[in-house]
Amino acid sequence: MRKPTALIILDGFGLREETYGNAVAQAKKPNFDGYWNKFPHTTLTACGEAVGLPEGQMGNSEVGHLNIGAGRIVYQSLTRVNVAIREGEFDKNETFQSAIKSVKEKGTALHLFGLLSDGGVHSHMNHMFALLRLAAKEGVEKVYIHAFLDGRDVGPKTAQSYIDATNEVMKETGVGQFATISGRYYSMDRDKRWDRVEKCYRAMVNGEGPTYKSAEECVEDSYANGIYDEFVLPSVIVNEDNTPVATINDDDAVIFYNFRPDRAIQIARVFTNEDFREFDRGEKVPHIPEFVCMTHFSETVDGYVAFKPMNLDNTLGEVVAQAGLKQLRIAETEKYPHVTFFFSGGREAEFPGEERILINSPKVATYDLKPEMSIYEVTDALVNEIENDKHDVIILNFANCDMVGHSGMMEPTIKAVEATDECLGKVVEAILAKDGVALITADHGNADEELTSEGEPMTAHTTNPVPFIVTKNDVELREGGILGDIAPTMLTLLGVEQPKEMTGKTIIK
């Protein structure tokens, strides 16, 4: 008889003391409450930096399953760069250092370009400020900024505040000048509208386009003509004698500080592809030996990468497979990619000894119409698998609290919680009957907050903690755990050694 170790993820099941608008608290859930009272339990943080997101940002299913399966904090790009700056690793980055060394040796210029805002979707201006401070520290004299104005991830007329903030940092560091200004409509096209990108390229390389004495003047003039941040024409900042402050020339270096690839690829290709054919770049095609991209943009961009992709080796699924154990991943359609692709660290293929069961989600317009979704079918299939002694490790996702929770409707969400509790009982009893152990948790909150304080539907995820129960009375659990600690805890229970790549810490004392 196999003694299964099962991870039961109650998707969207957060914990909050306040009962108002809280479907989790208002639902009748004798099984969950019984396990909470009977077995060792604690709560885990499932949002913000604990899961690799910016501080205070709610978690989501993709990030949650990625962290749980990886057994470590998987930093998203924005947070990864923020942490590198905070911990002093940013300045030591070899790719940045190589670009700086190149321009110092050749007496050439360093150009910084990217989206100038604090939107945090494609870029963050703090990353550019860190580059200005690094250039100043390393004694780079010629530093030029090619600012892409936002107006989309932030307010439509906010550019001036970001220009002011940049001026402050340039004043503080003694380095940097604005060279070109352009709305993201031109510089960050992703739909192969190359005529837009060409305008931006010609401003940066040839100094072609409307000219202004300052970035402020450019923005003021655009506003006067009814053109706001996103759509500002690629413009050139000029000196008193009307010559461009800077153009991009041979042997200059570029650091493109956008971290999200999709809208960075086209403009990067113009500068890095020797055989670029989308438009005629003209006589002057600067040779840039050091073109640095903040993250990996695309195979089509021939640049250096400052923050290389994180390879998630030795995820829980891989370690379990290497130990020769049989594992099952089971969910209904809505959460199937989460227990497979995301849980395996972005890997589609199954590991040796891995089996997958997909139960179709019901075909309804919205899940509040059928709060139980396909949970009974998922449960029946799983209980059958457990009774047949087929698997050592089980990864199960119950989707209801999240998918129905997104409706912001109390009654259906309470029903979803109650159906989840009923099926949780069936699964846990089947596991205990085999002398197995269940770990009951969630990837983030949702059903725990269905109404705003004004009584409006609250459809988003929450930042509340999630439960963690181990159905085994001879263990003690510590406080302060995170989702990345679950896999190490499972390995402890399985008696399998934790690999060094898994930096999470077991929750068992």
UniProtKB/Swiss-Prot annotation:
Residue sites binding Mn(2+) 2 per the record: D11, S61, D443, H444
Chain residues that bind substrate: H122, R152, D153, R184, R190, R260, P261, D262, R263, K335
Gene Ontology cellular component terms for the protein in this record: cytosol
GO terms assigned for molecular function: manganese ion binding; phosphoglycerate mutase activity
Pathway listed: Carbohydrate degradation; glycolysis; pyruvate from D-glyceraldehyde 3-phosphate: step 3/5
PTM annotation (Phosphotyrosine): residues: Y35
Active site residues of this protein: S61
Binding of Mn(2+) 1, residues: D402, H406, H461
Pfam family, one: iPGM_N
Cofactor note: Binds 2 manganese ions per subunit.
Catalytic activity: (2R)-2-phosphoglycerate = (2R)-3-phosphoglycerate
UniProt function note: Essential for rapid growth and for sporulation. Catalyzes the interconversion of 2-phosphoglycerate and 3-phosphoglycerate.
Protein name: 2,3-bisphosphoglycerate-independent phosphoglycerate mutase
Species of provenance: Bacillus thuringiensis (strain Al Hakam)
